[in-house]
């Protein structure tokens, strides 16, 4: 049996070309780990470590088992999945089927790796304003993405409780940091501010009310939690990772404008009918992360937004 606290040395990152996966891979490399980045297709920019194109949502788990054994992988991080640009069936394949096949692949390894699966706060669904969601609270998501992520989490938990694998699900808040996806609200706003900066113009931003409160968490803090969860096999099966406080997306956009220093004119626009948020409130209780992993959020949302802006404004022009 692997010691409870063993730093990962040979790590496979599914979704290794994505927002979290790419930065995680780079950090692992910097810490001396060997990294195998896996994704459906080769990225435009090289992924951290060695890259292998592998679409597990349509692939054979036995092939992945053979690859993981051959690479002597001791930790697998599932940063794959998603919702943007996908229909319900594609989301099911990318989130549920992929996770089930990953569990099968890891369980069949000659020396099964530790699995760290990245879940989401959206698995909780509706929550009363002012409350903090605990891992033991009933999860009742309304939106399809939350339902599918919950199904993936439940598959991991079942496998852990049955002794098939050593694993943990990190239920992440809304992660903010360098490399923010361009289709996200902050990614879109950062791109518009950067375009105005480059042109020497005033940025013109149209903003909906954005009054729903969310638990946003810094990317670097998130990576800290991933590494701690990978190293500690005694952690409980589900652990929340967030700041433990709720903020509006509007607040983060305002922080982004301040950090950019770009003159900005804001036009207030109503939200389209039928596009309201799943819930007006998300706030994670992170007590379990503190007690089981020794993790607490250290960085402010301003620091997270600052890193987002620095990465956006210094990126080479495509």
Swiss-Prot record:
Gene3D superfamilies: NAD(P)-binding Rossmann-like Domain (3.40.50.720). It catalyses: dTDP-6-deoxy-beta-L-talose + NAD(+) = dTDP-4-dehydro-beta-L-rhamnose + NADH + H(+); dTDP-6-deoxy-beta-L-talose + NADP(+) = dTDP-4-dehydro-beta-L-rhamnose + NADPH + H(+). The active site is at residue 145. The keyword Oxidoreductase applies. It is an enzyme of class 1 (oxidoreductase). One of its GO terms (molecular function) is dTDP-6-deoxy-L-talose 4-dehydrogenase activity. The keyword NAD applies. InterPro entries: Epimerase_deHydtase, NAD(P)-bd_dom_sf. Substrate binds at residues 120, 145. Transmembrane segments: none annotated. Pfam families: Epimerase. Its EC number is 1.1.1.344. Keywords: NAD, NADP, Oxidoreductase. NAD(+) binds at residues 19-20, 60-61, 95, 120, 145, 149. Belongs to the NAD(P)-dependent epimerase/dehydratase family. Catalyzes the reduction of dTDP-6-deoxy-L-lyxo-4-hexulose to dTDP-6-deoxy-L-talose. Can use NAD(+) or NADP(+). This is dTDP-6-deoxy-L-talose 4-dehydrogenase (NAD(P)(+)). It comes from Kitasatospora kifunensis (Streptomyces kifunensis).
